[in-house]
Amino acid sequence: MVYATDLKATLAGVPVPLLHAEGPVSPDVAGALAAGARDRLGATYGLGVTGVAGPDSQGGRPVGTVYVGLAGPGGGTVRQLTLSGDRDAIRAATVEAALAELLAAVRARSAELPA
């Protein structure tokens, strides 16, 4: 998990030009975080989450804007969430949504495998 913008590039492999062009909170950054996690860790799946938990907006994105990226054997997806509540509630809902995305992908992949 990387929080600081510079670490998104150095540790997770998010391209610096992407961070400069779109800022740290964008669907493309969430996708790049997920792909970076998968690639750098040699994992089957990678999750990437970026968003604004508050208390203030960031880069023109309102509080509660969250992007959940998932990279897996079948490619990648990014889901936008619009959440409400305080910082802790937004973070908790984000974790639940990210894990639900991962679980759904694992279940779908398991259903495709031969018995």
Question: Locations of the language-model features?
Answer:
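Short alpha-helical segments enriched in small residues
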Residues: 1-115
